[in-house]
Each structure stands twice: as structure tokens, then as C-alpha cells.
Amino acid sequence: MAEKMNVESFNLDHTKVKAPFVRLAGTKVGVHGDEIYKYDVRFKQPNKEHMEMPALHSLEHLMAELARNHTDKLVDISPMGCQTGFYVSFINHSDYDDALEIIATTLTDVLVATEVPACNEVQCGWAASHSLEGAKALAEEFLAKRSEWKNVFGE
């Protein structure tokens, strides 16, 4: 990583982090003063493990729908292409500990979900690729290690 790249995560040494963790990956201030806070919510150790797509896809649907029951500050929940985590973005919400609480509460909701929201061909671009049980297992595993979420580099 000799030169700084435009994408923040490309400047992160993925060999140094220790999943699971939640880190503030960046902030942006809009022309009217609104602030976006983007969090790297890392479920799996980069280059060692990944989430299987049906479970990841269902967890994305569940988190996107359920998190909005706990905050009106959520902008988006986006899966990482590497399948190791998600980006979670908030607007005008700088409280890291509260962001962690929203994530935890949302994942707790996932554990008791009875269906994946919008899991049909009308509302989803790949409705055949879902696993409610897989999503629940990912949520349970991540929640079990909540004490590690603030420790990005395993120190």
C-alpha cells in the first residue's frame, strides 16, 4: 500500500484487523451541513472466512428493514462485495456507542424473525438466494462477540 487510494477501505491493512468489529470508516459533510457517518461492520476475518451469499443476502434484507424500527437516522446498510461485512451509514448521528446499540438491537430482532422481508421476485433481484436460518446464525455469532466490536486491531 505505497500510495493513498481514493477508497477508504483500500487504505486499510486488512491483514492487521481482527473481526468481528465495528469501526467508523468515514464521514462526509454535505453542502447544507448534514453529516454522514459510515461504519465498517465486519462479521468475518478478511481473507480467512466469508459469509455465504444466501445468509448474507437475507441478513441484509432483515437488517435494512428492522434497523429502521430503531432509528430514523439510518441511510443505508450495504453488503461488502468481499462478503466479510456490511457498511452501515447514518445521517446526523455521530454517537458511536448508540450506533453499536442500534446494530445490536437490530441483530437481536433478526434472531426472532420468522421470515425474510421482501423475499420474493417482485421486491428482490435474486429472491431464490436467501437463508433465514443462515442469517440468524450470522447474527447470533456476531452478537456473541459484542465485547470485541470496539477492538478493530485485536489489541
From Swiss-Prot:
Binding site for Fe cation: H57, H61, C124
Reactions catalysed, as given in the entry: S-(5-deoxy-D-ribos-5-yl)-L-homocysteine = (S)-4,5-dihydroxypentane-2,3-dione + L-homocysteine
Enzyme class: lyase
Essential cofactor(s): Fe cation
Coiled coil spans: none
Family: Belongs to the LuxS family.
The protein's role, per its UniProt record: Involved in the synthesis of autoinducer 2 (AI-2) which is secreted by bacteria and is used to communicate both the cell density and the metabolic potential of the environment. The regulation of gene expression in response to changes in cell density is called quorum sensing. Catalyzes the transformation of S-ribosylhomocysteine (RHC) to homocysteine (HC) and 4,5-dihydroxy-2,3-pentadione (DPD).
HAMAP family linked: LuxS
Name under which the protein is recorded: S-ribosylhomocysteine lyase
UniProt lineage: Bacteria, Bacillati, Bacillota, Bacilli, Bacillales
Gene designation per UniProt: luxS
